[in-house]
Amino acid sequence: MSATVKHLSAFQRDILYVVSDLETPYGLGIKSALEEYYGEDVNTGRVYQNLSTLVDDGYLEKSSIDKRTNSYTLTEKAMQGIEHRHHWQEARADRAIAD
């Protein structure tokens, strides 16, 4: 069975989507992209707490850029989960549009 992201919060899923989209996904860059998407400020602590959880749960890998900055990359588990979620949403959207 492939990995899923169904137990993640919407905010955590959004973080995964942002990480997949950024050329160099680092904490404040992720925060900035989320703020652009939401159209409002996002609490820095909330971002880093959720990044840490996603690393601990095996959805992200963390590596150091320098002494103060970490970058994040999707794991295979995250990529499979995003793909699974995409197919799930697509099927429901197709049905909703057809109705």
Predicted features, each with a name:
Residues M1-T24:
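Short alpha-helical segments that sit at the start of domains
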Residues E83-D99:
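Amphipathic alpha-helical dimerization/coiled-coil segments
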Residues P25-L34:
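Short acidic, hydrophobic short linear motifs in intrinsically disordered regions
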Residues K67-H86:
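Basic, amphipathic "hinge/linker" alpha-helix immediately C-terminal to the N-terminal HTH DNA-binding motif
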Residues E35-R46:
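Short, positively charged loop/turn segments that connect secondary-structure elements
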Residues V55-S64:
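A short, conserved structural fragment
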Residues Y17, S32, E83:
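A cross-family signal for key residues in well-ordered alpha-helices
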